[in-house]
Regions:
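Catalytic toxin/effector domains delivered as secreted proteins or via bacterial secretion systems
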Residues: 1-109
Length: 109
């Protein structure tokens, strides 16, 4: 579940971190964390990109922009449970010139 993955990434169950009014899933060792789980259902296996019908791209880009602005230079990592999802986010961020967030493939071990 998404909650289980968030706990895995952040090391804390059910907590969030708010920095300058912007929500992150957590913070560990000075790094702002976001856990992304189960997005592969929105990704076309043939193209590796989000399906056209997936309406969440703009909100994800908005979330990224708000987090970068709120970070005050702190490192931001978005962790992904699925490698396919990581690649789709790399393409999405690159296409919109989103920089300042490290994308990490981090399956539950």
């Amino acid at each position: 579940s998404a909650r289980r993955y968030q706990t895995y990434v952040t090391g804390r169950e059910g907590e969030v971190w708010v920095q300058n009014g912007v929500r992150f899933d957590g913070m560990r060792d000075g790094v702002l964390l976001e856990a992304k789980d189960h997005y592969s259902q929105f990704i076309d296996v043939n193209t590796g990109e989000f399906y056209d019908w997936f309406g969440g791209q703009s909100s994800l880009l908005d979330e990224a922009s708000r987090q970068i602005a709120a970070s005050e230079g702190a490192l931001i990592e978005w962790h992904f449970s699925e490698e396919r999802t990581l690649h789709a986010f790399e393409q999405l961020f690159s296409s919109q010139n989103i920089e300042g967030i490290s994308l990490v493939f981090d399956p539950i071990k």
